[in-house]
Design a protein with these regions (language model features):
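Fungal secretory targeting signals
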Residues: 1-24, 217-218
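Generic alpha-helical secondary structure signal
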Residues: 57-60, 64, 186-189, 201-205
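C-terminal helix/juxtamembrane-tail motif
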Residues: 202-218
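Hydrophobic alpha-helical segments
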Residues: 167-174, 194, 198, 213
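Surface-exposed acidic, glycine-flexible loop patches that form ligand/cofactor-binding
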Residues: 72-78, 175-180
Length: 218
């Protein structure tokens, strides 16, 4: 609650100078999007949330927003969906966190734990949020309070669960998408390289769960 209160108290910092205008992969169809049981299989701790965990979302709560993001960013194949959900579940600790808790980097968060500069770019890509950040060219030199306020704009569920798909499509681009569609193992390595991390054993556990959930482990 303190975090939310801080966000709302800082929103004037953001709006003061804005205007009033507010392959080989198996395909999936929009009628066969990931379901709650599949997402629980990938993120097993998402079965429930503690009342004192405001960031936390269960798989049941997350599923419609994840499905919406796949449709919005036109992610149609299971290889890419599996890689995306493996990353989301790992980074958010099974959807328990949407801002960086340790070491607590200001402005870092969403389901894929984007850094502050990407959260600003993501906010600018969303028509409802763009006017609120239109006057902010970059995160360089911004106070921690402002960085966290920008993060707060993109952490409501409808935006939080879309950030990973946005990053994959807009920041990693066609080469990584095609690599995932051709070969999940090789493509996942390319995806993690784009994110700026290694394919650790911990990340591989989530990928293997995703492969099993979507029948890609045979």
């Amino acid at each position: 609650m303190l975090y939310n209160c801080l966000l709302f108290s800082l929103l004037p910092l953001l709006v003061s100078s804005t205007t009033a205008n507010t392959t080989n992969s198996t395909n999936i169809t929009f009628n066969n999007l990931p379901n709650t049981l599949q997402i629980q299989q990938i993120a097993p701790k998402s079965l429930s949330c503690l009342p004192c965990s405001p960031d936390c979302r269960t798989a049941h709560q997350a599923t419609p927003f994840i499905a919406s993001s796949l449709k919005k960013y036109k992610i149609h194949d299971l290889n890419t969906t599996a890689a995306l959900l493996a990353l989301m579940a790992f980074e958010s600790v099974d959807f328990r966190y949407k801002h960086n808790v340790f070491p607590g980097r200001p402005g870092q968060g969403t389901v894929n734990m984007q850094s502050a500069n990407f959260n600003l770019l993501y906010a600018k890509s969303i028509p409802a949020l763009k006017p609120l950040v239109a006057s902010i060219p970059s995160v360089e030199g911004l106070k921690n309070e402002t960085l966290n306020a920008i993060l707060g704009l993109v952490t409501p569920d409808e935006y939080n669960f879309g950030s990973a798909a946005w990053f994959l499509v807009k920041e990693c681009g066609r080469d990584v998408l095609r690599a995932l569609q051709r070969d999940l193992e090789g493509g996942f390595g390319a995806y993690m390289k784009c994110v700026g991390v290694e394919v650790s054993e911990e990340r591989r556990v989530y990928l293997e769960r995703a492969k099993k959930a979507f029948g890609l482990d045979s």
